[in-house]
Each structure stands twice: as structure tokens, then as C-alpha cells.
Amino acid sequence: ILSKFVGLESEIRSRIKFDEDGYFDNTDIIGDFNILQQAANHALANFAGKRVTKVFTAAVDGIPLATMVANALGVNLVIAKRGKEVGVKEFLEETFVLKDSGVTITLYVPKDAIKKRDSVLIVDDMIKTGETQAALVNLVRKAKAEVSGIFSLIAVGEEWKKKLKLPEGCPVEVVTYIKQP
């Protein structure tokens, strides 16, 4: 299974091309069913022994991967969104400022989507500053549930880990770490 994983990492790396502003287009990665399937299997191998009752991501780009991971683990998916869903009465919400942008973002999740006894795996396609993932961790805490781990395809450096304030021994699994260009 390790050689398959090494193949996954090099496949992802080969598709990362930064533009002159230091951004990259991840469409090729998050839209590739083969990559998503391999990544979901990798998450399954890493988190199968852990208690996971929900997979949690933020809209939009993390959804394809989180869907595949939730399916592989046989658990439900919860998506934090930037807008309040019509028909939902109560929400948990978390507001944060996007680093270096001055833009404030609020993520909303239906209040009963994550229960007190849930053990939540946070999944995202990419972690850059960790702001979004920290907001997801805070939403899990507001629901009085526990974070069972973090899983991502790509992470830029490792500075972001400090922001998450994860409990001791909480696993963080990233397929490939890249340096900021």
C-alpha cells in the first residue's frame, strides 16, 4: 500500500504549478476521481483504527475529497458553508479573518449536524494558512464533539499546525507538503 501512496504523492506533486502570485490551480487534482479514490484509501488506512463518526469540511474545494473519505470510512459528511442554508433554524458559526487579506469569513453549520458524542475527521484538499481548518476545529469544539484527526492532500509548510490548537496526540495526515514559492 505504501508504493501506491508514493505514487499518489508524486502524481499530486506533478500537477502543482504555481503562478507568478504564488497561487496554483487545483482543478486538475480535486476533479480527478483516481486521485480522490487513492487519497480516500490512504485516509482509510490511516484513520480506520480511530473512532470517526463524521467527516467535516468547508465548502467548496474540499467537498470532493471529503465525500470520498466519508464514503470510504462509512460515515456521514458535514459541510461548513459561507452562507446560511434556508430551512435550517439554528446554526453554529465561526468567523475568522483570512490572513493578509483583511477579508472576514463566517462559516455556518446546522446546529445538530455535529453531535456531542461525535468524533470528527476534518478533511480538506489543501491547507495553506490553517485559518479555515482552525475555524472547523472551533466549530467541532462549539458542538462539544471531539476532533479525531486532520487529513489533507496538500499542505504549504507546517506553520499552520500551531493555529489549530489540536489535542495532544491528535493525528494530522498530509499526503504532500510543499514550500511556499
For every predicted segment, state its role.
Residues 64-73, 136:
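Short Gly/Thr/Asp-enriched flexible loops that form oxyanion-binding sites at enzyme active sites
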Residues 118, 124-142:
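Active-site/ligand-binding-proximal alpha/beta "capping" segment
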Residues 62-66, 158-161:
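Short, well-ordered alpha-helical microsegments
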Residues 75-120:
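Short, glycine/charge-rich flexible loops or terminal/linker lids adjacent to PRPP-binding catalytic cores
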Residues 4, 134-181:
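PRPP-dependent phosphoribosyltransferase catalytic core
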Residues 1-51:
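Active-site-facing substrate-recognition patch
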Residues 52-59:
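Short glycine-rich phosphate-binding loop at a beta-alpha junction
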Residues 53, 118, 148:
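Conserved acidic residues
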